[in-house]
Regions:
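Loop/turn positions that initiate beta-strands
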Residues: 293-295
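Conserved "cap/hinge" positions at secondary-structure junctions
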Residues: 277-279, 298-303
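Glycine-enriched loop-and-adjacent helix/strand subsegments that border the catalytic/binding cleft
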Residues: 55-266, 311-335
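A conserved acidic, glycine/proline-rich C-terminal tail/linker
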Residues: 262-291
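Short, Lys/Arg- and Gly-enriched loop/turn segments at beta-strand edges
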Residues: 285-286, 304-315
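Cysteine-centered motifs
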Residues: 6-9
């Protein structure tokens, strides 16, 4: 199983004064994305410490949660026969990685083998062999605790969020979305710097965050995705969680969608689930420029009450460090 090259991470201590960063270098012979979050909730008067190993979490993406993205990506036609209750409802949840417990076997090959390969990196994307076009997909990823009742998920409890690249192959003819998402180690990205979620509501921290994304090519910074507020996802907060629980439990194997519940139960009902909740629309540059060898893809989640988009782009152009309230993912493309 492939592993990420991550060997360091950051702590965030959440207090009445805001987020206070503490850095930790992990000494581990088998480098994992091991993210320690410390969140102090003043109203509860205790400190919550979480050790998180992404390679043991099931990971997913949400298709069609920003109006217009699927059309730009040339994927809207794939969902022609997928019925939704609302016009702006996302189309499907798709898997990007399903961990198998050490003692478990992939009984009856329920989980496609390629989905059991760990695809995440904090620093690079390796170009898929034989493919001509791959595209950055800038997203907000959320880490959840999953509460199970037998083989069904009853609750998804949001823990933290961070910048994510749901990098995708652009080609026609793939039977399932997941076939364009995981082509092996170093095919996806999650920032090593996650931020604790205080409340997954319009009153919580996420409501002031925005998603910006860029391509750095030959030293020049280009805006890649439209600068977008997380609150402007078509489905967000309770509505999104209710929808995701329903899809994780009941989504059928039809069209580009897959039976997610069968994968999760075959994997032993993972306690941690990471979901990238949808890619933003592209700028004109992003629509027409695919990732090439040596390009650097950048996804940044930042609080709009502290920074403007112009300030974020300027800091990137000047190669300045970002503050602890910003989640950043840099990935260099390697052929």
């Amino acid at each position: 199983m492939g592993r990420s090259d991550c060997c360091s991470c950051k702590f965030l201590v959440f207090t009445n004064a805001g987020f206070i960063p503490v850095e930790l270098v992990l000494k581990t012979p088998d480098p994992l994305i091991l993210i320690h979050l410390i969140a102090t909730y003043p109203q509860k008067k205790y400190i919550h410490i979480m050790n998180f190993d992404l390679s043991k979490a099931a990971t997913f993406g949400v298709a069609g949660n920003f109006t217009g993205h699927l059309e730009q990506a040339g994927e809207a036609v794939d969902f022609t026969n997928i019925k939704t209750a609302e016009q702006n409802e996302p189309k499907a949840i798709f898997p990007t990685y399903i961990p198998l417990p050490d003692a478990a076997k992939n009984k009856e090959n329920i989980i496609p083998d390629f989905l059991t390969v760990f695809p995440f990196s904090t620093s690079k994307i390796i170009y898929p062999k034989g493919e001509q076009k791959i595209q950055l997909e800038p997203e907000c990823a959320i880490i959840f605790d999953a509460v199970w009742n037998n083989d069904k998920i009853e609750q998804l409890i949001p823990l933290s969020f961070g910048a994510s690249n749901d990098c995708s192959i652009r080609k026609a003819g793939a039977a399932k979305i997941s076939q364009k998402k995981n082509w092996g180690a170093n095919s996806k990205g999650l920032s090593e710097h996650l931020i604790a979620i205080d409340s997954f509501t319009s009153n919580g921290i996420l409501n002031k965050y925005r998603i910006a994304s860029f391509m750095i090519r030959n030293g020049e910074v280009f805006s890649y995705g439209e600068d977008s507020a997380i609150r402007d996802y078509s489905y967000i907060y309770k509505k999104l969680i209710d929808w995701m629980i329903n899809k994780l439990n009941t989504q059928k194997n039809e069209g580009p969608a897959e039976n997610i519940n069968s994968y999760l139960t075959a994997a032993g009902c993972p306690q941690k689930i990471m979901i990238s909740i949808g890619a933003t629309r592209y700028t004109e540059f992003g629509k027409t420029n695919f990732l090439n060898d040596g390009d650097v893809s950048v996804v940044i989640l930042y609080p709009e009450d502290k920074y403007s988009f112009e300030q974020i782009k300027s800091k990137l152009e000047q190669n300045e460090n970002f503050e602890s309230d910003v989640s950043v993912l840099y990935q260099t493309v390697t052929v």
